[in-house]
Amino acid sequence: MQSNNKLKKNQDFRMVYQKGRSMANKLLIIYIVNNNLEYNRIGFTVSKKVGNSVVRSRVKRLMKESYRLNEGKIKTSHDIVFIARPNCKESTYKEIESALLHLIRKMKLIS
């Protein structure tokens, strides 16, 4: 994932939360909004409720890797934010990947 494909500014995250559609499952929440660009911009959020910094970083790395490996299947021109729920801290990579793909399918983002 290139650095220009990441959501970084608080203003960008707020816009996705306010104007985007959302869906959730046991492990993750997804927010999505069209961005009129030729690529997706992605943001990952893990709250302090999930655990200490080591746990939060692990969960964020697992989410990023799950997205990276499936990036080619996902339609472009969207801003997407993934939020980890507290159940994520005990989850394996496969569980997080299947939860992420489940949400992407539900939002009809698979090309």
From Swiss-Prot:
Sample GO molecular function, one term: tRNA binding
Reactions mediated catalytically: Endonucleolytic cleavage of RNA, removing 5'-extranucleotides from tRNA precursor
Keyword annotations: Endonuclease, Hydrolase, Nuclease, RNA-binding, tRNA processing
Paired cysteines (S-S): none
GO cellular component, one term: ribonuclease P complex
Keyword Ribosomal protein attributed: no
GO biological process: tRNA 5'-leader removal
Enzyme Commission code: 3.1.26.5
Enzyme class: hydrolase
InterPro entries membership: Ribosomal_Su5_D2-typ_SF, Ribsml_uS5_D2-typ_fold_subgr, RNase_P
Pfam families: Ribonuclease_P
Keyword Secreted applies: no
Domain of life: Bacteria
Alphabetized NCBIfam families for the sequence: rnpA
Family: Belongs to the RnpA family.
Quaternary structure and partners: Consists of a catalytic RNA component (M1 or rnpB) and a protein subunit.
Its job: RNaseP catalyzes the removal of the 5'-leader sequence from pre-tRNA to produce the mature 5'-terminus. It can also cleave other RNA substrates such as 4.5S RNA. The protein component plays an auxiliary but essential role in vivo by binding to the 5'-leader sequence and broadening the substrate specificity of the ribozyme.
Protein name as catalogued: Ribonuclease P protein component
Species this chain originates from: Alkaliphilus metalliredigens (strain QYMF)
